[in-house]
Amino acid sequence: LLGADVVPALAKKLNALAVVTDMSPLRIPKRWVEEVSGALGEAGDSRPLFQVDAHNIVPVWTTSDHHETMARTIRPKIHARPDFLGDIPELTPNSAGTALGKANDWKKAQASLDLDLTVPEVKWLKPGAKGASDNLQSFIDQRLKNFADLSNDPNENACSHISAHLNMGQLSAQAAVMRVKASRRHPDGVKAFVEQAAVRRELADNLCFYNNNYDNLSGAAGWARDSLQVHASDEREWTYSVQELEEAKTHEDLWNAAQLQLVREGKMHNFLRMYWAKKILEWSPSPRDALERCIFLNDKYELDGRDPNGFTGCAWSVMGIHDMGWKERPIFGKIRYMNYAGCKRKFDIQ
């Protein structure tokens, strides 16, 4: 990972015409870009620094100039820009070649990063560009037909399973949407996929780009923040420590199963991710603790963790981001409620 202490000297050594960086709306990567920009300026370097939003289909600053509060407000803005689904040009090789002067010291590179190496790697998902492409194709061939109707049932294998590839830059959302649309099969599935991969995903980036408090209660709408505060001291029938949650030692089998899948596989079904976070709100000493725990566990174990979608999912579940007020009840206040009985009605929990 090249930072402000490396980039100016490297750009000078390579006689680069410009420095180009990707875009992430999250706080830490945004700070990295600011630090590199500042270092170039301090070094008296006149090379321009370009930031390209390859994270989204439509650049986040092009879609909207403010925080969008609902999917329905950003949806027409995304669909109004089909020009961003134009053909991706073939990469033209340059004459520099790929030979390296010396082998990279990957252990040194890894040691320079703040990583939690206690979480074991998983085997079920093949990484890299080829693994991502193969996984997307298997979705188109086998699961797209059921995506619209069955993707909310954890018992069905109807999800795309590409969120980790998108998160790690092994697959672009633009390429994924274009390939799914080009399949010309299962129009309901295609529509549902575009909603998730384009509208919902870019709504998450919009939140993190324009709301600096995307990971704390200050980022909530007034109605949600006030409601949670009113009910912050409500009596909880069940409360658990972070360790008990992490080790899936609660009284509820469904929640424990979801948590165990998260720890063992680095994933959790999308519907259960909502339920999982709602229960953490119900079983934590306070809403602030609940949000911190959701983000901690999500980022530690999810293959698609530390991503705008993850922060937004936690924020939706705990503090009502992109949602409206619901019937007031203990602990949750006006935040949308989910419970075990509702899951039993929706799918076979056994």
Predicted feature residues:
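Soluble or luminal CAZymes and related metallo-dependent hydrolases
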Residues: 28, 128-131, 250, 254
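Short hydrophobic/aromatic-rich motifs at helix boundaries and adjacent loops
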Residues: 4-8, 147-150, 227-232
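Structured loops at beta-to-helix junctions and adjacent beta-edge loops in soluble globular domains
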Residues: 22-24, 52-54, 77, 139, ...
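Glycine/tryptophan-enriched, flexible segments
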Residues: 45-47, 59-61, 65-223, 346-350
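Trp/Phe/Arg-rich N-terminal binding region typifying the photolyase-homology
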Residues: 1-92, 189, 260, 279-313
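Active-site-proximal binding-pocket segments
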Residues: 153-349
